[in-house]
UniProtKB/Swiss-Prot annotation:
This is Non-canonical purine NTP pyrophosphatase homolog. Keywords: Hydrolase. GO terms for molecular function: nucleoside triphosphate diphosphatase activity. Belongs to the HAM1 NTPase family. It comes from Halalkalibacterium halodurans (strain ATCC BAA-125 / DSM 18197 / FERM 7344 / JCM 9153 / C-125) (Bacillus halodurans). InterPro entries: ITPase-like_fam, RdgB/HAM1. GO terms for biological process: nucleoside triphosphate catabolic process. It is an enzyme of class 3 (hydrolase). Its EC number is 3.6.1.-. One of its GO terms (cellular component) is cytosol. It holds the Pfam family Ham1p_like.
Amino acid sequence: MHKLVIATWNKEKRDELSRYFQQMDVSIQSLRGDIPDVKETGATFIENARLKAEAVRQYEPTAIIVAEDSGLCVDALDGFPNVRTARFMEGTDDERAAKVLQRLGDRPMSERTAVFQSAVVILFPDGLMRTAVGKIEGWITYGPVKDGQGYGGIFILCDEQLLAENIQMARCNHRSQAIRQAVYYMEEWLVTV
């Protein structure tokens, strides 16, 4: 049985990724305590996910490594906050979402388009790397930020006119799209080994 390491220290993200892979013939492992956090210096979500996976590969050379990076990109703000979604300023996700609302000001809804994006990178023990992406498009509301909802509390889905917080665990969110594609790649690889 192959060992699969989820390359994140974020418990919620680790649990979400694990749920998708638990039916596969792999032994899912969390990061070991001696593996340091990775500096996310990439210019894209794919680059950051790759950096995480490659960093863990140094400690787990025979494992399948799965890493993910995601965030919000607001068109009128030239893609901001993009790869810095969780770290463009100190504070909570709610405070960062409020800052996005502040930067958008009173722009009309036609100028408030945005996309949640996710990239999942899988590094296989044989050196193969596969990349999966997911996205949901929508608009940023006029606010206010719903307490405890972060960016999901200010994002309206294009096709549902529904706040993204309501689809956090739904099949159509950006992360689940990317993970489902990654599961397909994993199944494909497992059949060949």
